[in-house]
Amino acid sequence: MFNDIPVFDYEDIQLIPNKCIISSRSQADTSVKLGNYTFKLPVIPANMQTIIDEEVAETLACEGYFYIMHRFNEEARRPFIKRMHDKGLIASISVGVKDYEYDFVTSLKEDAPEFITIDIAHGHSNSVIEMIQHIKQELPETFVIAGNVGTPEAVRELENAGADATKVGIGPGKVCITKVKTGFGTGGWQLAALRWCSKAARKPIIADGGIRTHGDIAKSIRFGASMVMIGSLFAGHLESPGKLVEVDGQQFKEYYGSASEYQKGEHKNVEGKKILLPVKGRLEDTLTEMQQDLQSSISYAGGKELDSLRHVDYVIVKNSIWNGDSI
């Protein structure tokens, strides 16, 4: 039963080094394959309005990174797919599960996107299973990511319905308050939930939420993730769509959750909040730093590629890796 498994989160885990076999971290390969495509890093900027827009998506695709466009400007999705395909780039969009989304999916037959993410807060539901089956029937070549979920049963059920990958994480994100508003979720034990779910998975798992440092990417891969979706570390850049705000002479960018009243436009079923983040500089600099840090992780793992991270030992240190310091 679940109560017998170890419960921990990112800050509770330290990975144990192996002998380094490369002469420079630049020799470490951080690329990852998802479906028929290979991407430069196993990270995905969260498909949120304050993280990604069409310009950011195009930049990421041009540079060889995976992206998922958010679903909150519904009318723009078909023109976006055409724009990306006209430029020879992959199209990766999000859909919900409302009735009109079925007709939308069917309308994409002539210009199908390479990736569709079914994006709802509680993905272990009949509505998601039915949408997976519909997409697979109408667009059989499209890679379907479904979520979000937090249990092995959910992973198995979505995979059996036809999902090509599942997204694991219920409310661990920095601007998500699901655990506070509902009492449910993987907030505070996201890494243990990832480990639990990945043991049941036969297809790729995307860890979504709770990433606070670049080292958490390596930890996610160690515990079963193929890719890692990240919000707060990608928010607040000069290119980020979030509104620019000046406070006491310092510039900030807005960052809010996908179930917040700021995104929904109403105070109903709110499970997200808004925060201000100091402007961080350019997105490409963060991506470069992430890659370099992940290359260092691979070198500590004693390998040359991401898979080496899956085989390292670890210790559970219960919140002590910061030695009393806060991040």
Swiss-Prot record:
InterPro entries: Aldolase_TIM, GMP_reductase, GuaC_type_2, IMP_DH/GMP_Rdtase_CS, IMP_DH_GMPRt. GO terms for biological process: purine nucleotide metabolic process. One of its GO terms (molecular function) is GMP reductase activity. Gene3D superfamilies: Aldolase class I (3.20.20.70). SMART domains: IMPDH. The active site is at C176 (thioimidate intermediate). Keywords: NADP, Oxidoreductase. Its EC number is 1.7.1.7. Belongs to the IMPDH/GMPR family. GuaC type 2 subfamily. Catalyzes the irreversible NADPH-dependent deamination of GMP to IMP. It functions in the conversion of nucleobase, nucleoside and nucleotide derivatives of G to A nucleotides, and in maintaining the intracellular balance of A and G nucleotides. This is GMP reductase. It comes from Streptococcus agalactiae serotype Ia (strain ATCC 27591 / A909 / CDC SS700). The gene is guaC.
